[in-house]
Amino acid sequence: MATKFGDDFTVGDVLDAGRITVTETHVVNWAGLTGDFYPLHMDKEYAAQTRFGERLAHGPMIFALAVGRVALSGVGGDAAIAWLGADNLQMIAPVRIGDTISVTVEVRE
């Protein structure tokens, strides 16, 4: 994707930042990095007894993976000086190990 800067975007633009498959390695590394070893993420037997039936990925990790996809997509190049936030972030479903997430960004203003 060609690098775009502020004036190159139009309200309503939807940018495809690609896909990534969540792996066991992602979950284990995230737990070690953050100290979040909650059993729903780490304990297969515990997770099997929950309404989800299996382990889930950490929600903040999914957000971080999405941010990584946006960064690697080339949108903005090296122009981003600071991360100023995300509005209306939605986690629409649980993410399991082996799931592939698709990342899109919509220009709102």
Predicted segments, located by residue:
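Hydrophobic beta-strand-centered segment that forms part of the acyl-chain substrate-binding groove
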Residues: 48-57, 61-108
